[in-house]
Amino acid sequence: MNIDLKRTPLMVLGTSSGAGKTLIATAICRCLKRKGEQPIPFKGQNMSNNAWVDTKGREMAYSQALQSWSAGLEPSAEMNPVLLKPKGDCTSEVIHLGKSVGTSRAINYYEDWFDSGWEAIKKGLAILLKSKTDGRLILEGAGSPVEVNLQHKDLTNLKLAKYLNANCILVADIERGGVFAQIIGTIALMKPDEKKLIKGIIINRFRGDKALFETGVTWIEKETGIPVLGILPWLKEIFPPEDSLDLLERKQINQGAEIEIAIIKLPRISNFSDLDPFFSDSSIQMRWIEPGQELGEPDVLIIPGSKQTIKDLESLNKTGLSNQIKNYAKKGGNIFGICGGLQMLGKSLEDPHQQESINETSTSSNMGMNLLPIKTTFREIKHTSQREEKVSWPFSQNIKGFEMHYGESDLINNKDSEIISLFKNSSLGWVIEKKDKSFVGGTYLHGIFENDEWRRQWINKIRQKKGLNHLKIDEENNSDKRERLLDLLTDAFEKNINIDILIK
């Protein structure tokens, strides 16, 4: 071990991507907090376009922000020192300690970024442990820890476990099938000094009577010499998954609800967690629309953020979905864009530094839908910050969120008297409300729908146009709901899993 620790770290490894590492690490954070400890969540390297911005304006994966809330801490970029944000075409933006440091193609990543990534990880650890001297690190691995072709350059699994001499938990997803092969195969591919770090096994997503798996537990423990810490059942209430595919496959929620929200499933969608507050609202049905599908007549259309706005807009143009959106607006449809979605609604998108285009020379893709009189220019420096601003529509109130974008948008002209600034700070968003009470607008403020009162008034605007009664503000706000779900998750974890032998 190369670093002084008062408490042995716990590390959650998985037999594969999607095994359940994120939620289990999240539950362990709350579990230890209940025991009077101070857990410190940490994921050395994460790949995700679902990001959060901390109070210092630095980017980190949303899953580590969730884990920090579970631990009772304020999110900080040191908890996720290396973040890779896929841009498509085997290319990712590289974020070190919250700041963008470059772009890398997958084939060159380890050669170009391994050493600096490892230094960022060690620096993040040092800063966290200096401020939380009595805390216990709760580490989350990434994917499988035994990808033999990549293992020598793996920043965030067994290299980190050995560096910290962590007690490791191996999570296997029984829902996928082949759970015995998952466990035995993963351990067999480890070196002797790596195997000895595995102190427990968790069987995740089990359906049915656990008594039916007792012989399986006995066999696993006999073959591996490692105790099975418990069997976690399939949980009905879950959080935003790390892999966007899991969420996007929820094509219809609350079928038959009074209001239908359609969401464009952009090929390079980012920050889909902006939409989470709607998924637990029983008055709303959510429907995903892929390029090439029919838009239909939803009550409102949301165009979410994109990691590559110009390419995603080009996809909408090629498949005819842009024309469908324009026709929907002409017929009185309600449209709202977030970040990249706002940019697409404008007249033009200029990329002089090729932040979005990546060697694209085409200019046709730079024409927006022209539903808002704004022009977007992508700058060399990304703007990231938390914000609290006064919103002016559909009513006046202070709301919170965060910015995370290269593009800057400005009004081309203000001759259209219908357009208004959403905020006192006009560069954060605009809206046009037409005589028939339909609207087209958008904002750069991620997390805007987390503001419960504003979200309800926004929905009531749509309900009013449809002739429905206004709904009251939810008694349970989004933050309280998240806390309740964290407690429910931890209750289920504590009922089924025993980690006491790992923390003594």
From Swiss-Prot:
GO terms for biological process: cobalamin biosynthetic process. Residues 258-454 form the GATase cobBQ-type domain. Keywords: Cobalamin biosynthesis, Glutamine amidotransferase. Pathway: Cofactor biosynthesis; adenosylcobalamin biosynthesis. The keyword Phosphoprotein does not apply. GO terms for molecular function: ABC-type vitamin B12 transporter activity; catalytic activity. The active site is at residues 339, 446. Coiled coil: none annotated. InterPro entries: Class_I_gatase-like (IPR029062), CobQ/CobB/MinD/ParA_Nub-bd_dom (IPR002586), CobQ_GATase1 (IPR033949), CobQ_synth (IPR004459), GATase_3 (IPR011698), P-loop_NTPase (IPR027417). The keyword Cell division does not apply. Belongs to the CobB/CobQ family. CobQ subfamily. NCBIfam families: cobQ, PRK00784.1. Catalyzes amidations at positions B, D, E, and G on adenosylcobyrinic A,C-diamide. NH(2) groups are provided by glutamine, and one molecule of ATP is hydrogenolyzed for each amidation. This is Cobyric acid synthase. The lineage of its organism: Bacteria, Bacillati, Cyanobacteriota, Cyanophyceae, Synechococcales.
